[in-house]
Amino acid sequence: MKILVTNDDGINAPGLSVLENIANIIAGSNGEVWIVAPSSEQSGVAHCISFTKPMRISKISERKFSVDGSPADCVLAGIYDVMKSNKPDLILSGVNRGNNSADNSLYSGTIGAAIEGTIHKIKSIALSQYLGPRNIKNKDPFEAANYYGAQIIEKLLEYNEWGTGDYRVFYNVNFPPVGAKEVLGSKLAPLGFRENSSFSVEPSLSPGGKRFLWIKGGPQDIPTKENTDAEVNLNGYISITPMNTDLTDYSSLEKLMRKFK
């Protein structure tokens, strides 16, 4: 198996090394693991691509490259440049430093990479490590992802539910904010929504008196509805959320089609 690994935290992020180790387990001795990751921090860029400017790509080692672009750019670079003669069978994005559960998923560059892979009909999984008081000061805050990552990916590959249409399924996996020994298991869960925890802006002044706005995030320890992703994470479970690149709301479409007749 040939695996392309990317992230949104950048080429030097600790979570990328975690995912490289996981990918090597999945690929096996006869497989290949290639890394194409952003040269700098790209958190919060979602599924953006850099079609208005060229991207610089740098070779770090035989199968490791950095790209001056977004996570989705890195996927494109991996598919159509770095691995163009031997395209990947699987794309893994992460392991993100922080959760991408609930409405956080809508901003995530980690998930943006998985979306891009799915558009090109390649199986794609986004993985993120929830951080909180019970794991952030651990020697290895990514311990849960390190320990269970390969197991979760192998299950998803075994079950083989990726869809067959033009718009296909990818997976959003979030590891709970606890150490590996405290993980209670895994649960399939839909996206939750954090009430009163969305992004806002915080005004500030520079020393020269110029006005700036900082994006400000809300607390991450607010549980979502029962059995949704962030809620199961905060209760010690790994959440697995199937997601689709088709953004159509078919329920509303059906109702409106009857009204527009």
Annotated model-derived regions:
Residues I3, S17-Y80, S85-K87:
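A cross-family phosphate/adenosyl-ligand binding-site feature
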Residues D9-S17, S206-G208:
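Short acidic, Gly/Ser-rich segments with clustered Asp/Glu that frequently serve as metal-coordination loops
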Residues G28, Y80-S85, G112-K123:
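Alpha-helix C-terminal capping segments
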Residues N99-S108:
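Glycine/threonine-rich flexible loop motifs
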Residues S108-A114, P141-Y159:
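Active-site glycine-rich loop that binds ribose-phosphate moieties when present
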Residues T118-P141:
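Glycine-rich phosphate/pyrophosphate-binding loops
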Residues L157-D166, F170-K261:
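C-terminal accessory domains and tails appended to enzymatic cores
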